[in-house]
Design a protein with these regions (language model features):
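Short, Lys/Arg-enriched N-terminal segments with co-localized hydrophobic residues
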Residues: 1-17
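Membrane helix-loop-helix hairpins that form the core translocation module of multi-pass transporters
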Residues: 24, 28, 58-124
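A small-residue-rich subset of transmembrane alpha-helices
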Residues: 57-87, 154-189
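Transmembrane helix boundary and interhelical junction motifs in multipass membrane proteins
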Residues: 38-44, 141-150
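Alpha-helical multi-pass membrane helix bundles of inner-membrane/thylakoid proteins
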Residues: 11-13, 110-141, 195, 223-231
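Small-residue-enriched transmembrane helix starts and helix-helix packing motifs
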Residues: 18-37, 59-64, 125-138, 160-169
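Divalent metal-coordination and catalytic microenvironments
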Residues: 39-42, 70, 105, 139, ...
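Selective transmembrane alpha-helices of multi-pass membrane proteins
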Residues: 90-117, 194-231
Length: 231
């Protein structure tokens, strides 16, 4: 079977069969995209932003913009890797994942300190959307491309790869949009009570901070990233 980006001779299959097979691959990509968007490091990071939104529409937009940032990164770097027929060394892949851990700790810290000032400034919609888009970009850089390219071993041309990435990306947008809409409900309603909202915001921050520390330890120590850099 040809890998993505390689030009080989077509197998003796009828065109309708090949079209059906490709559509099946795209549908699988859509499902995998939805599933991928709901990975723990994704939903924890986005929750820290959504927890401070007072309108459900902003929570929904946050999920969409995370997916856009994630998809744009996958598309650009995924196609580049395909065209250059290259791959990142494990050290760099793990380093990008380690950055996600740092980001989670940072986002968690911001939430934990959010109510330390008496005059709390609600983040503007533009600020929130920029932040959540950057989070999506970082997640897109951190190993997702490798997983997508592995799945794309069933397609044979660059344009099919590009289409697959876009469909996969649409799946991540749909998945995160649904999640942020649902998770945004308790945060929006709790915004009427400072005490309740403070607890929820700090809870989201605590989870993000703790998971970020665990994530960095897992990659740096357990998976051996630090040893790779020392060599």
């Amino acid at each position: 079977m040809n890998k993505c980006g390689e030009m080989g001779k077509s197998e003796n299959k009828g065109e309708p069969v090949m079209i059906i097979q490709f559509i099946s691959v795209l549908l699988l990509g859509l499902i995998l995209g939805i599933k991928h968007s709901l990975e723990p490091d994704h939903i924890i990071a986005v929750s820290t932003i959504v927890s401070k939104d007072k309108r459900l529409s902003r929570s929904t937009l946050a999920g969409a913009f995370w997916g856009i940032g994630h998809t744009a990164t996958l598309f650009v770097f995924g196609i580049l890797i395909v065209l250059l027929k290259g791959e990142l060394a494990d050290k760099w892949v793990m380093s990008l994942e380690f950055i996600v851990g740092i980001m989670l700790v940072y986002l968690g810290s911001k939430n934990l300190l959010f109510y330390t000032n008496r005059n709390v400034k609600q983040p503007t919609e533009r600020t929130s959307l920029i932040k959540v888009t950057l989070i999506g970009i970082i997640h897109g850089l951190a190993g997702s491309a490798a997983m997508v390219l592995l799945t794309m071993s069933t397609v044979s041309t660059v344009w099919q790869c590009a289409l697959y990435i876009l469909v996969f990306g649409i799946g991540t947008i749909i998945g995160m949009l649904i999640f942020t809409t649902i998770i945004g409900i308790p945060f929006v309603y709790s915004s009427k009570s400072i005490t309740t909202n403070k607890l929820l915001v700090r809870f989201a921050g605590s989870v993000s901070f703790a998971f970020g520390v665990y994530y960095m330890y897992s990659i740096g120590i357990t998976d051996g990233l630090f040893k790779l850099w020392i060599k």
